[in-house]
């Protein structure tokens, strides 16, 4: 784990498409119960997600989200600045992108990108 004392950012040399592809490669919907579907848009650097709808109490509620690489980068930075959150692979992600992290950190970043905070621990 790394203790962040200043703003931490994913290396800006990691291309947007690669950053998003790294997330898609985790096959997160198979591992994260709140995430129903995740697809990388081949035409634009954008992730399309279907995830739990926090405003709907029904069991299979879902809401669609479009998440850009900029949103992923901003969510990662926000989480590293939050003293309540510890990303175990933050140093590796800073140096090489989310493909060098772990599913737990990708989970936290995706939740923050969709909901503005971590909901599902």
Walk through the language-model features, giving the residues of each:
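Long, contiguous N-terminal structural blocks used for assembly/anchoring
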Residues: 1-62
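Alpha-helix boundary/N-cap detector
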Residues: 10-14, 18, 26, 63, ...
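Acidic, low-complexity, intrinsically disordered interaction modules
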Residues: 75, 89-90
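A motif-centric signal for short, conserved binding hotspots located
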Residues: 78
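Non-catalytic, low-structured ubiquitin/UBL-interacting segments
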Residues: 84
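Short leucine-rich amphipathic alpha-helices used at interfaces
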Residues: 91, 95-97
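Short, compact, well-ordered microdomains
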Residues: 98-120
């Amino acid at each position: 784990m790394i203790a962040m004392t200043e703003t931490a950012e994913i290396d800006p040399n990691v291309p947007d498409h690669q950053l998003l592809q790294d997330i898609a490669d985790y096959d997160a919907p198979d591992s994260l119960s709140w995430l129903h579907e995740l697809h990388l848009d081949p035409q634009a650097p954008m992730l399309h997600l279907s995830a739990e709808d926090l405003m709907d109490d029904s069991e299979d509620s879902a809401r669609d989200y479009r998440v850009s690489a900029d949103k992923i980068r901003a969510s990662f930075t926000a989480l590293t600045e939050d003293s309540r959150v510890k990303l175990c692979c933050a140093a590796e992600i800073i140096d090489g992108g989310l493909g060098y992290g772990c599913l737990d950190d990708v989970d936290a970043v995706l939740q923050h990108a969709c909901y503005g905070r971590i909901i599902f621990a």
